[in-house]
Amino acid sequence: MRLTDFSFELPESLIAHYPQAQRSACRLLSLDGPTGDLTHGTFTDLLDKLNPGDLLVFNNTRVIPARLFGRKASGGKIEVLVERMLDDHRVLAHIRASKAPKPGAELLLGDDESVNATMTARHDALFEVQFNDARPVLDILNSIGHMPLPPYIERPDEEADRELYQTVYSQKPGAVAAPTAGLHFDEPLLERLRAKGIEMAFVTLHVGAGTFQPVRVESIEDHVMHSEYAEVPQEVVDAVLAAKARGNKVVAVGTTSVRSLESAAQAAQDALIAPFFGDTQIFIYPGYQYKVIDALVTNFHLPESTLIMLVSAFAGYKHTMNAYREAVKAEYRFFSYGDAMYITYNPQAINERPGE
C-alpha cells in the first residue's frame, strides 16, 4: 500500500487551535462500519449509541509539561522534549539545537536557566539526560516545563492548556501528547453514561512524541512504528471478557486504547486477551485482524498518518476516506482540539485494500 493512498485535501482553516468551550459540545460524525452510512450530530449523542452493559475503555495517561527551553553551558540555545521518564532523575528526550550536545555536556534549563542537567548518553535519536537536582523529575517538569502542544497547533502553550490538553480522568503522568478522543468527556457526560449502566475500564499508554512523526516511506508496510509503554491490567481483561460474554460492545476511546487492547490480545497465547505491561510497537493498517474492539471513538487524524491507517483497517478503506471527505465538506474541526467520530466495526475491512 502506498502512503499517498491515505492522503486527503485539508484546508488550514479546519485545524483546531483551541478546544470547544464545553468539552462534550463538539460535533460527532458517526460512521456505520458495515454500510458506510454517516450521521451528523453532537458528542453527547454517544449516550444513544451505547447500551447498558457496553464497555468504554479509556486511556488514563496524564500529559506532562515535557517541553523545556534553555541552553548548553557552552552557549547554544536548546529545546528539550522529554519522551520518557526513566526514573526520578533521568529522562530520554529529543533535543533540538544548532549542534547536538555531546555526552557530558552541561545543560541549563528553564526560562531562568535555574535547573542544571547533564546529557549523559545518546540512544539513536534520543538523548539521555540526568537532572542534577534533589527534586524528582516530575516536580521539575511541573515547575519549569511547557505543555507539549502538537506541532500543527501553531501558537505558544498557555496556562489554560495545562488543564484543557488533559482528560478529566487522567491519572498516571508520562505522556507527551494527550489521548485526544478522551478530551471530549466531561464529568456530566461521564455521570450520564454511568447512570445508563455503561461500564468503564482504564488502560494506560504513555503517548510519545513519535505519534507526530510523519511516515517517511512510500510503501507503508516498510514503516517502523515508534515504541510506547502500555499497561492493560487484569481488571481490564476481566471487564472485556465479561462484556463479550454478555453480548455487549467493547468501545475503545481513542487510538491509544485500541493499540493497548490489541497489543494485549496479540500477547495472549490462547485467550482472547491477557494482561499486558510493556513496550508496544503495534502498527495497525488495512489487512489487520481486529480481535477485541467493536466500536471506536476517535478524533480526525492527519493525512498519511498511521492513525488514519488504523481507522481504515477498522471501518474499511473506502468508508474511511469517504467519511473524511464528507467531514471536510461539512467543515468539521480536525486534529487534537477538534471534533470526534464514532465508528462501528466493519468485518469486511480486513479484505479491503486501497486501489481495489
Swiss-Prot record:
Keywords: Cytoplasm, Queuosine biosynthesis, S-adenosyl-L-methionine, Transferase. It is found in: Cytoplasm. Its EC number is 2.4.99.17. InterPro entries: QueA, QueA_dom1, QueA_dom2, QueA_sf. Pathway: tRNA modification; tRNA-queuosine biosynthesis. The keyword Cytoplasm applies. GO terms for biological process: queuosine biosynthetic process; tRNA wobble guanine modification. Transmembrane segments: none annotated. Pfam families: Queuosine_synth. GO terms for cellular component: cytoplasm. It catalyses: 7-aminomethyl-7-carbaguanosine(34) in tRNA + S-adenosyl-L-methionine = epoxyqueuosine(34) in tRNA + adenine + L-methionine + 2 H(+). SUPFAM superfamilies: QueA-like (SSF111337). The keyword Amino-acid biosynthesis does not apply. It is an enzyme of class 2 (transferase). Transfers and isomerizes the ribose moiety from AdoMet to the 7-aminomethyl group of 7-deazaguanine (preQ1-tRNA) to give epoxyqueuosine (oQ-tRNA). Monomer. Belongs to the QueA family. This is S-adenosylmethionine:tRNA ribosyltransferase-isomerase.
